[in-house]
Amino acid sequence: MHTFSTLPAAEGFRMPAEYEPHRGCVMIWPVRPGSWLYGGRDAQPAFAQAARAIAESETVWMLAGPADAGAVQAEFAGDENIHVLTIETDDAWARDVGPTCVVDEHGTVR
């Protein structure tokens, strides 16, 4: 793993706006009881539908905790552009709790 010794802004990196072109979308499978009734059961079909719609034009990385990863992998087994990653999560709002990238004026991603 590479560790950077400076802050991204010091090297000309910035957080891109949501509407800017990007490589793909990170989603998190909804299961958290504090956010979703019945372990997300009623929200999961909508998340699957949204992921498939997004995957028509870009890569989707769907994060799922170890307890749910098998079922989520089965859900998207036939979807070539959706990649399920087994990662412990705390919520389904990837924008709030997921990974993020910064870019510079040359399009370099960090």
Regions found by a protein language model. Give the residues of each.
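Histidine/cysteine-enriched polar flanking segments
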Residues: 1-110
